[in-house]
């Protein structure tokens, strides 16, 4: 039975009912709806709507229903209820009779659903933070095992300067740390309880909303009833955080795809996260990484869709806001799946020490060291930059690395270059010199790994 039928003289058309009903997706809020209802039943005792005995009967029935939901949430979908609120109330009435009809006193589905989705989002934030931390720990572990693996660092996908695989891993640790922090920030802002705001103007019962908020594990009650039932900032903020984090994961996946390619051959992905070809028997495709990269669009699409949904809505609640759920459910599921899969990808990764070093020795990635060397000899940087550029052109022409040129060849471009130049052109020297905080020197990378391990205990 609909919760609003008294005003109407005609039955709802089935076409509209199918279009309007949301149980097929908001059933995921069943636990939150039940927990919120238990909290509301306690509040109704304080304003003499329910007796202590009646409240206990309702709480026992709701707790029983909660156990049933947790054991088989999919069973909800067999029902014909309009939404999860209708379903919970219907099942409650089945258990306790007319007493169940008293529970909705002073409450609207507007503040009810606002509560449910906030409670759900808070729970997902905690779960997502755990997954993000697990990926960070796996990256730190991978970095620790590959501290001395030298590889080329890239700009414009061209070899730029030598780095280590560990330094690359730690770059993603930092990106994910910002994602974790954004989740924490979002949690603090969403930690306000809208229940008791009614349809839009507040409940007519003198309920202590601060006590109600505390009972439902919120930091405080919301301050404005009109805003409370209209607010979907927490959904948009989580979608924004998810979109940005998915962009980080996509970059990670793209790097892994390139590193795994036959052209680079820096890493080998496990058979457990790759697939083959139905035609070409030699293929081993990085599908896990490609799917992470490919799923970014659906998360960003959910953010865009939600922004468009709320941008023109007058206060307060509008049915458009029912469109908030499918996007956030799918986006956060997708994000968590991708974070967990990225962690799994790293579990059995094999890094080729020989191939990465071979690649780092090519591409004149020690050119900046030569420019800095000339600066140390008193040559202005702009001049040294030009000199090294000409030297690289020559080295390419004669098919040599900079470290392979003779002093006589160097003197074609600058007499400031002496025998000590060879020491600074080595890969190890290139790494060691980048010793400022955050740099690629093995000492700094080891410090970063140790600090991260301490932080993520």
Swiss-Prot record:
Swiss-Prot/TrEMBL keywords: Amino-acid biosynthesis, Arginine biosynthesis, Cytoplasm, Lyase
Compartment(s) where it occurs, according to its Swiss-Prot or TrEMBL record: Cytoplasm
Catalytic activity: 2-(N(omega)-L-arginino)succinate = fumarate + L-arginine
PROSITE patterns (UniProt xref): FUMARATE_LYASES
Residues in coiled coil: none
Enzyme class: lyase
Gene3D superfamilies with a match to the protein in the record: Fumarase/aspartase (C-terminal domain) (1.10.40.30), Fumarase/aspartase (Central domain) (1.20.200.10), Fumarase/aspartase (N-terminal domain) (1.10.275.10)
Record-level Gene Ontology MF annotations: argininosuccinate lyase activity
Keyword check for Lyase: yes
Keyword Methyltransferase carried by entry: no
Pfam families xref list: ASL_C2, Lyase_1
Protein EC: 4.3.2.1
Example of a GO cellular component annotation carried by this entry: cytosol
Signal peptide: none
InterPro entries the record matches: Arg_succ_lyase_C, Argininosuccinate_lyase, Fumarase/histidase_N, Fumarate_lyase_CS, Fumarate_lyase_fam, Fumarate_lyase_N, L-Aspartase-like
Pathway: Amino-acid biosynthesis; L-arginine biosynthesis; L-arginine from L-ornithine and carbamoyl phosphate: step 3/3
Alphabetical GO biological process terms: arginine biosynthetic process via ornithine; L-arginine biosynthetic process
HAMAP family to which the protein is assigned, alphabetical: Arg_succ_lyase
The family this protein is said to belong to: Belongs to the lyase 1 family. Argininosuccinate lyase subfamily.
Name of the protein: Argininosuccinate lyase
Organism of provenance: Histophilus somni (strain 2336) (Haemophilus somnus)
Species classification: Bacteria, Pseudomonadati, Pseudomonadota, Gammaproteobacteria, Pasteurellales
């Amino acid at each position: 039975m609909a919760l609003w039928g008294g005003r109407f003289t005609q039955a709802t058309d089935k076409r509209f009912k199918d279009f309007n009903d949301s149980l097929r997706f908001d059933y995921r809020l069943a636990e939150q709806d039940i927990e919120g209802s238990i909290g509301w039943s306690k509040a109704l005792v304080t304003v003499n709507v329910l007796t202590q005995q009646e409240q206990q009967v309702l709480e026992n029935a709701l707790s029983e229903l909660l156990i049933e939901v947790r054991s088989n949430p999919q069973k909800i979908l067999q029902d014909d209820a309009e939404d999860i609120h209708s379903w919970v109330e219907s099942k409650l009435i089945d258990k306790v009779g007319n007493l169940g009809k008293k529970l909705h006193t002073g409450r609207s589905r507007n503040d009810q659903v606002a509560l449910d989705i906030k409670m759900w989002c808070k729970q997902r934030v905690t779960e997502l933070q755990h997954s993000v931390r697990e990926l960070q720990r796996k990256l730190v572990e991978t970095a620790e095992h590959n501290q001395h693996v030298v590889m080329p660092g890239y700009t414009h996908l061209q070899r730029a300067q030598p780095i280590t695989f560990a330094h690359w891993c730690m770059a993603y640790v930092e990106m994910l740390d910002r994602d974790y922090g954004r989740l924490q920030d979002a949690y603090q802002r969403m930690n306000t309880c809208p229940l008791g705001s009614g349809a839009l103007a507040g409940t007519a019962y003198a309920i202590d909303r601060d006590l109600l908020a505390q009972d439902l594990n919120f930091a405080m009650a919301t301050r404005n009833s009109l805003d409370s039932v209209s607010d979907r900032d927490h959904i948009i903020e989580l979608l924004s955080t998810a979109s940005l984090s998915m962009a980080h994961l996509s970059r990670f996946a793209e790097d892994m795809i390139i590193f795994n390619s036959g052209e680079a051959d820096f890493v080998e992905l496990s058979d457990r996260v790759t697939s083959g070809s139905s035609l070409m028997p030699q293929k081993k495709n990085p599908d896990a990484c490609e799917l992470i990269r490919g799923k970014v669009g659906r998360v960003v699409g959910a953010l865009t869709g939600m922004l468009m949904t709320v941008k023109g809505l007058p206060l307060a609640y509008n049915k458009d806001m029912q469109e908030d759920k499918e996007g956030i459910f799918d986006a956060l599921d997708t994000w968590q799946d991708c974070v967990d899969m990225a962690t799994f990808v790293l579990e059995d990764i094999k890094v080729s020490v020989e191939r990465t070093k071979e690649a780092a020795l090519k591409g004149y990635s020690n050119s900046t060291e030569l420019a800095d060397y000339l600066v140390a000899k008193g040559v202005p940087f702009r001049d040294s930059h030009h000199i090294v550029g000409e030297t690289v052109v020559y080295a390419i022409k004669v098919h040599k690395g900079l470290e392979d040129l003779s002093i006589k060849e160097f003197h074609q471009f600058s007499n400031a270059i002496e025998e000590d130049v060879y020491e600074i052109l080595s890969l190890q020297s290139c790494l060691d010199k980048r010793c400022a905080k955050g740099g690629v020197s093995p000492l700094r990378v080891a410090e970063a790994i140790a600090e991260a391990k301490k932080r993520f205990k």
